A protein has these predicted regions:
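Noncatalytic carbohydrate-binding groove/subsite architecture in carbohydrate-active enzymes
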Residues: 174, 181-209
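Acidic/aromatic-lined carbohydrate-recognition and catalytic surfaces
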Residues: 1-99, 103, 116-185
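Hydrophobic residues within beta-strands of alpha/beta enzymes
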Residues: 109-111
Length: 209
């Protein structure tokens, strides 16, 4: 049996999707979390980041891209820009890729940080702490950044996305396994996500419990 590691919260910054996304006129322009610098600041300079989120790997969770003139979100390394799962085209591309591997005999997927794919935004699509956002960010910590985890882990559309994945990728297939790495998920939510009746994932592993 072969269970593949699946990383779809983010891609490499060398991925063709990201390279295309640097062009605001490209069809991939909205495939990542791009944001302008804060008003009244100089793009690329400290303090111009869209909000005060810190990366899990240290420093800001935002990296300035001169080619596009905007920042992109990376919860981990700046080499790993976060995909925008709010975009149906992103989800379609992910599901097509998963089907491609299953059609070639893979037996399932171990999904890297899959519970970070849904970000919490306000009614205008703005993230907490962004200029003009209806959502307040958390206070900054000792390193000068706030914690994005409460707004990115186990987000509002996560169940919807995982159930859609189940239908689009696994419906009609037998003998497959889905295992999700689930940062920020409570034991109670674990039960919901792995309940067969909810059609999401078979198993989760949580480092917090």
């Amino acid at each position: 049996k072969i269970v593949m590691d699946l990383v779809v919260n983010h891609t490499s910054d060398e991925h063709a999707w990201f390279e295309a996304s640097k062009n605001k006129d490209d069809e991939h322009a909205d495939w990542y979390w791009w944001r302008p610098a804060r008003p009244g600041t100089t793009p690329g300079e400290p303090g111009a980041e869209p909000n005060q989120w810190g990366s899990y790997f240290g420093g800001s969770a935002w990296e300035y891209c001169p080619e596009r003139g905007e920042y992109f979100l990376h919860q981990f390394s700046k080499k790993q820009p976060d995909l925008n799962w709010e975009n149906p085209a992103v989800r379609r591309a992910v599901y097509d890729m998963m089907n491609w591997w299953l059609d070639r005999g893979v037996d399932g997927f171990r999904m890297d940080v899959i519970t970070l794919i849904s970000k919490r935004t306000d009614s205008n699509g703005k993230l907490p702490g962004e200029y003009g956002s209806e959502l307040e960010d958390l206070p900054v910590g000792e390193e000068g950044y706030s914690n994005p985890n409460p707004f990115c882990a186990d987000g509002p559309r996560q169940d919807e996305f995982l159930a859609e994945m189940r239908r689009e990728v696994f419906e009609g297939r037998e003998g497959f396994l889905t295992v999700g790495e689930a940062p920020g998920v409570t034991a109670q939510r674990n039960e919901h996500i792995t309940d067969p009746g909810n059609g999401e994932l078979d198993m989760l592993f949580l480092f917090e419990h």
